[in-house]
Amino acid sequence: MQFGELVKTLAAVESTTQRTTMVKLLTSLLKRARPDEVDKIVYFVLGDLKPPWEGVELGVAEKLCLRAVSKAAGTPLSELEAVYKRTGDVGEAARRALSAAKRPGLLAFGQQKPLEVSEVYDTLLKVAKAAGEGAQDMKISLLASLFARATPEEAKYIARFVVGKLRLGVADMTLLEALSEAFGVGKEALERAYHVWPDMGKLARHVAEGRPLEEVKITPGVPVLPMLAQRLSSASEILAKLGGAAVCEYKYDGERAQIHISGGSVKIFSRRLEDITHAYPDVVKAVKESVAAGEAILEGEIVAVDPDTGDMLPFQELMHRKRKHEVAAAVESYPAVLNLFDVLYLDGEDLTGEPLIYRRLRLSEVVHETEKVSIARWRLFDDPGEVDVFFHEAVSLGMEGLVCKSPTSIYEMGARGWNWIKYKRDYKSEMIDTVDLVVVGAFYGRGKRAGLYGAFLLAAYDPQTDMFYTVCKVGSGFTDADLKKMYEVLQPYKIPHRHPRVVSKMTPDVWFTPQVVIEVIGAEITLSPLHTCCLGAVRPGVGLAIRFPRFTGRYRTDKSPEQATTPAEMVELYKRQKKVAQPE
C-alpha cells in the first residue's frame, strides 16, 4: 500500500467527530491492505512502532525533526522553528516547508516512486535503533531521506509520528472493532485474544493472515492485560456481592507489577504493559532467589520501604526509579520489596482458568518468602465484623485498605468485574473515594493563571461503549508548578475539535485527545444536567458530576485512559456516599 493512501485515512480520522465514522474509515483501510502491511498500519495508527513492553522509541525531539525537514526541503531551520512556534505543530511546519520547496530532478515529488507503508515503517525502525556515536546524524539522514520523497501531506504525518504527536486518539478497542469488521472475526473472541496477547499489530496480522485465534496463548515475556477491581464502602456489601465469603488481602500503596520468569531471566511489566525491569534490579535479584520455577507469570505490588526502619513509604517514592541515571542511587535510598498476590502461569500450565484459592496454593508452593519477596497478607472471611478488623489492621500498618476477592473466581484478563472489590481507607471522605479521570478539555486561566490552563474538563471511561463521558470541571488543588506541568504535558494532545470518543455538553476553550489521567476527589457526587457521565442512569435527563472537585496532586501515569474510573463505578460511589446528593 502506498503511504499516501494511509495518510488520506489518517487525515479523515483526524477530522471526524463521530466514532462510528472513525471505525468505518479504519475498517476500509484494513480491508485494502496486504496481510504483511496490516501490522505496520496498525502500529502507525496507534502512534507506535512496537508494543509498549518492547520499549522501541524513536528518540526524536522537535528540533532534530525540523533539522531533517530543513535538510530535505532546503528551508532554513530558523524559518521552520518560527512556523512551529506559531502553530505548535511540527507536522504543519514540515507540510509548509515541503509545499514551498524547490526540489529538482528526482527530488521533485510526483517524479520519484511514491513511498510505501512498509518502506516508511522500516526506515522509522532504523531511526529508533540508531544508537551510539553519530546516532543523531544517522537519525537526521534517515528522516531527511523520507521527507525528500514525501508529499507535503505525507511529511506532515511523518513529522508528527516521529515526535510522538500524531494526535489521532484511536484506542485499541476502536481498532479491535475495525479488525472484526474487516476480517469477519467475532469481536468477543478478538477481545479475549487481545487480553492474552495485547500486541495490536501482531494480532492484526494474525487475523489478516486467516490464522485461528486459538493459537493465541498466554506466554512468558508477553504481558497480559491485568484484571481490575470494582469498589464498595462496607464489608457487609462486599461479602454479599461475593456470595458470602471473600479472600481479603492487604492493598499496598505501590506499583502493580507482572513478573515474568523464563529461561533464567526475569522481566517486570507495569499495569500499562511497559517493561520496567531496569527500574528494579533489586527486585529482579530477589525474585531469582525466592521463586522456584522455570517459567512463571506472577502478579504483585512493588512497594518502597524506608532503609532504616523497614516501614512502607508512599507510592510517590518509587518515582525516583523512573529516571534511568538515578536507579542505582534510588535502590540505596528507596529500596523496594515485592508482595505477590497471584500466579497466572506456571511451568507450562495456564492457571488463569483456575479458582483463586487454587492459584494461591500454587503460589505458596513456589515462593520462598524472604525480606524482599513475600506473599501479600491475606485471610478468608465470611463475617463482616472480622473483615472490618482486618481492614483497620491494614490501614494502621500504612496500607490503602483491602482488596476482597471471590475465592472461586478465575483470573479475568482485562476485565473490571465484581469478583475483585476494593475496600479503601478513603471511606471517611464524604465522596467515599478518589477517582481517576481523563483530561478531555481545558479552560484558559485568568489573572495569575493567564497564559496557562486554569481549569480542566475531566471524563470517565465506559468500556461498554469505548467512549469518555464528562464528570467535572476542576480548577482546585493545582499549585503553580502543577498548572505549568499540565500545560506542557497536554500540549502534544491538543486537537481542533471534540474527539470522536468524547461525549460532552460543555465546550471548553481547548480540546484534547483523551490520554492524561489524574486523581480527583470532591465533596460529593451529585446529579447534574451539565455532564454526560451516567446520563439517565439515576434520573432521566441528568448525569452524575463531582461537586467541589479537587486535584489530589497525583498524576496517574501508571494508568492508561482506558483504565480510568468507569461510569459504573461512579454510580456505585453515588449510591454509597453518606450524604444524599441533590440536583445542581
From Swiss-Prot:
PANTHER family: DNA LIGASE 1, DNA LIGASE 1/3 FAMILY MEMBER
Catalysed reactions listed for this entry: ATP + (deoxyribonucleotide)n-3'-hydroxyl + 5'-phospho-(deoxyribonucleotide)m = (deoxyribonucleotide)n+m + AMP + diphosphate
NCBIfam families noted in UniProt: dnl1 (TIGR00574)
Pfam family, one: DNA_ligase_A_C
Protein name: DNA ligase
Role, per record: DNA ligase that seals nicks in double-stranded DNA during DNA replication, DNA recombination and DNA repair.
Organism: Pyrobaculum neutrophilum (strain DSM 2338 / JCM 9278 / NBRC 100436 / V24Sta)
GO biological process: cell division; DNA biosynthetic process; DNA recombination; DNA repair; lagging strand elongation
